[in-house]
Amino acid sequence: DTEFTTQVPTGNGPDLIVMAHDKLGALVANGVVAPVDLGEAKSNFADVAVKAVTYNGQTYGVPYAVESVALVRNNALTKDTPTTYDDMIASGKTTGVQYPFIIQMGDKGDPYHFYGFQTSFGAPVFNTNADGEYTSELAMGGSGGTDFATWLKAQGDAGVISPSITGDIAKQAFLDGKAAYTVTGPWNVAAFREAGLDVSVLPIPSAGSQAAQPFVGVQMFYQSAQSTNTLIAKQFFNYLATPDAQEKMQKLGGRASAMPSVADKSDDQDIKDFSKVAESGALAPAIPAMGKVWSFWGTTEANIAKGAEEPEAGWATMVTNINNAIASK
């Protein structure tokens, strides 16, 4: 995206580019992408996909794929479909394997993989305005954030989560049949299937009292603000917004379409299941303030899980640090 942002003002950049939606805020701020009207096709896309291509009330591209993490179950070990975190742990323990549930964290933390659990405590990363768009006002403070931090500490004390569990360790443990459940995305599910595992993709169970909403990423086509082929670009965008084009991209890319009706017709059960999880997920913020969040957020989660910081005080310090970073720009 840096190269695109540099090239567009000179007139040398491409007419179209494909990137994740979380680049949208920066691209609009730099004036390098043009609005794109989805027209009547707008209603065919998942709400989360439409939100993804919308910034300050304008749509800026055509979404084509949605992606999120989900709960993945080893069907050889259990056929339970837990709706709460505690039920999942209890179910996993009955299998007798080393890990009732495993999730990657690493020494820098992993807010992305843990976000579904965090939202179940009513602690989304940012507040939203009346139109449902994110503001730069943090929503992770208050009782919801404290409750999530306290839960993190309890799971760390219980040995369920740990900064010592990296992505590779979690993946290998699941591949080796040492874990009943994990939270991961389609990239690892493909590897599980290639290894011959029988798995199912399920909604993430709630650890708190609300629904678990993992982050949803959306892949989209953008149009350069300096494009000289606007008529051809419009025709191409109109085609990309048809079910036919969406179905072809889904087959080629192996990712759930941004159109639920297209994903529902797939003969790939994983695509169908990930699509359903994404539909009820939370769009990953595309606002510039998001760049100030990750480092403090992840480090604090890891420290709380391993007992290096007290939950309430550590979380409050994190919120203060993030707010200061956002204010300093």
What spans do the regions from the language model cover?
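Glycine-centered hinge/linker elements that transmit conformational signals in sensory
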Residues: 132-164
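Periplasmic-binding protein-like
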Residues: 198-221
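Hinge/lid segment of periplasmic solute-binding proteins
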Residues: 19-68, 80, 85-89, 97, ...
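Mature extracytoplasmic/periplasmic domains
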Residues: 33, 187-190, 219-292, 328
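Extracytoplasmic/periplasmic solute-binding protein
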Residues: 60-64, 69, 88-137, 144, ...
